Amino acid sequence: MLERRKAAGEYPEADLVFVSPMRRCLETAEVLYPGQEPVVVEEFRECDFGLFEGKNYRELTGNVHYQAWIDSGGTLPFPEGESRGAFQDRCCAGLVRMAGICAEWERAEEKKGTGRRELRSACVVHGGTVMALLERFGTEGGDYYSYQCGSGQGYRCVAGGSPEEIGKGEIELSCIHPLVFSQDLS
């Protein structure tokens, strides 16, 4: 499916590709952006699900910790894992680091004298990472779960902020729109 969507031009072009260090993100980045050296952002690693890791809801049915987590609306920390707040803080630190790399790229382009242009970057990350970043930095007012996206899906957005603001973690993600795919490729 990814290959067909890529061939149809449905994924945006990118000057820089940022990825989670986990294998499936690295492999997906290679499919979507072949030949580009991805920039690994450790902070974009998937959430630590603790005792729930690798288990589906059927396997967790009857587990008192799982039921408590469900009853909390997904706000409790994962037992022996990460809290949503800690996960979000980690992801946001990664976005701040990513923004610094993007600023360096833009300065280098400016020095080349080819005329400054806006950097096009792509992030190949986990759904939870997307949700964490858009909830924290998005200007659209959505909550964590409103930014869920399926495998191979995502959002386009515009990142903004002065170098000083970005250095303080004050980034704005605006014009947030889901990627739209042709119906015949699903």
Spans of model-derived segments:
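Active-site-proximal alpha-helix that buttresses catalytic centers in soluble enzyme cores
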Residues: 1-36
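A generic local structural motif
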Residues: 2-8, 25, 63, 108-110, ...
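Active-site catalytic microenvironments for nucleophilic, acid-base chemistry
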Residues: 31, 35, 97, 101, ...
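Phosphate-handling substructures
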Residues: 32-92
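GST superfamily/GST-like fold recognition
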Residues: 127-131
